[in-house]
Regions:
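A glycosyltransferase accessory/donor-loop signature
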Residues: 1-26, 33, 37, 186-312
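Histidine-anchored nucleotide/phosphate-binding helix
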Residues: 31-45, 329-334
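Short loop->beta transition adjacent to catalytic acidic/histidine clusters or analogous donor-positioning motifs
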Residues: 44-53, 78
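Short internal beta-strands
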Residues: 50-57, 151-152, 341-347
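Active-site-proximal specificity loops/subdomain of glycosyltransferases
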Residues: 71-114
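Short aromatic/hydrophobic "clamp" motif used to bind/position activated sugar donors
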Residues: 123
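Conserved donor-nucleotide/metal-binding helix-loop-beta segment in metal-dependent transferases, i.e.
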Residues: 130-163
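Hydrophobic, well-ordered beta-alpha structural blocks that scaffold small-molecule cofactor pockets
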Residues: 294-419
Length: 419
């Protein structure tokens, strides 16, 4: 107890750090992912933190109570804002927009100025699928831009493996300035000058249906010119770090962003999965017995999925795509029967993907019914192919499901734990 008192005194001697998360939890399982992020935030700072949770009616009272318990155990503050109750008309319009790629919570960060207390002058926004492997006060002490915003450029966050964005292709935003909206810092007095950014931004999306990252494209439309470019350590994409040419052997002091379902908890050798799970087990959501049962269920699901994949591959012309220098070696070292398969090199160099090679191959070989097995940068290629109308599971698959037989989506596993 004495140690906890000393820790509390130390916290009270520092400035308050304000951090915000947005949660839409229709299934009841997403709260668990945010809990791991919060645990990493608490564990890695001695600062006094107030967490502001923007949520709606999908956040259950049980999960809210667990968040409160988690914060109190760390001597921190947590405040909840029910957006359905505070801004019912705006939230109704967001939920009626029928964008199934992103949850309504993605837009809640555009409404901060309407719900935060006036004494909050600066705030960090964090996506729920992040692990804070540094002291959050370091980010809080960074400057913001002339327009009151600080963020990491997407090209840097993805180590130059980002998918093209239409808002950049049409010249509205310079590609090198386009930033990620998953980790942001706002000077709230300046951000408050844009009270209608959410609804006005939704009108922009209506005029440009090709803009497929709603909140991110809106924020870039308004702020890409004069925001402060944060160092990449404040928004580092885990999927990019797993690429053979970028892979790091040790964890760094940074904020890891598990965007694109990058959590694969049953791949135990992966340092980023280990990092996430090390924090998750400390949360009030973790139950060891339930977890072990879920892993067993997950393994059976993986086995069943392999059978489905093999049926999809039957009587198809198989095309592996990836980096000739690294992925081809992985393929040759695997036990997969590659007889008759084509390998499509889609890398100009170790950091540059030529997405057009995938698209051109499909167009030129339609009659041969090709099945593309993507060996690296799958989230990026998946997004690009889906935008062109190709179907995951029919036209292309993630080859890692064949090369590694112990994987299952981390979010799927967490859903199983929630049963």
């Amino acid at each position: 107890m004495g140690e906890n008192i000393l820790k509390e005194i130390k916290k009270c001697s520092t400035n308050m750090v304000h951090v915000c998360y947005a949660i839409y939890d229709k299934t009841g399982s997403f709260s668990r992912i945010a809990a791991a992020s919060l645990q990493s935030l608490y564990d890695n700072t001695d600062a006094w933190v107030t967490v502001h949770i923007l949520h709606d009616n999908t956040l259950s009272e049980e999960n809210k109570e667990k968040y409160i318990y988690q914060a109190r155990m760390q001597g921190q503050n947590i405040v909840f804002y029910n957006m359905d109750e505070l801004l019912p008309d705006v939230i109704a319009k967001i939920k009626a927009s029928d964008n199934d790629r992103f949850s309504p919570a993605a837009m809640y960060r555009l409404l901060l100025m309407h719900v935060l207390p006036k004494n909050v002058k600066k705030i960090i926004y964090l996506d729920c699928d992040t692990i804070i492997n540094l002291d959050i006060e370091k980010l809080y002490n960074e400057p913001v831009g002339e327009n009151g915003v600080a963020a990491v450029a997407e090209l840097e966050a993805t180590f130059y493996h980002a998918v093209e964005k239409e808002i950049c292709n049409n010249g509205t935003v310079k590609r090198e300035n386009y930033f990620c909206s998953g980790i942001l810092m706002f000077d709230t007095e300046k951000y408050n000058n844009y009270p209608d950014i959410c609804l006005d931004g939704m009108e922009i999306l209506k005029k440009h249906p090709e803009y497929d990252c709603p909140d991110q494209d809106i924020l870039n439309y308004y702020f890409a010119d004069k925001y402060y470019h944060l160092p990449v350590k404040y928004d580092t994409f885990v999927d990019a770090l797993r690429l053979p040419e970028i892979k790091q052997d040790e964890l760094q002091e940074c904020i890891y962003h598990y965007a694109g379902n990058a959590m694969e908890l049953t791949k135990s050798e992966d340092i980023y999965n280990q990092l996430f799970f090390n924090y998750y087990v400390k949360t009030p959501w973790f139950d060891g017995n339930v977890f072990l049962k879920a892993v067993s269920v997950a393994m059976k699901a993986r086995h069943d999925a392999d059978k489905v994949i093999m049926n999809i591959m039957k009587d198809r012309n198989i095309v592996f795509c990836g980096n000739k220098e690294t992925d081809l070696q992985r393929l040759q070292a695997s036990k997969i029967n590659c007889n008759g398969a084509v390998f499509l090199n889609i890398y100009a160099d170790k950091n540059t993907i030529i997405m057009e090679k995938c698209l051109d191959y499909f167009e030129q070989n339609k009659k041969d019914r090709p099945l593309l097995l993507v060996m690296s940068a799958y989230p990026l290629i998946n997004q690009a192919l889906a935008q062109k109308g190709y179907k995951e599971g029919t036209d292309y698959l993630d080859a890692s499901t064949l090369l590694i037989h112990d994987g299952i989506s981390g979010r799927d596993l967490l859903k199983m734990i929630n049963l």
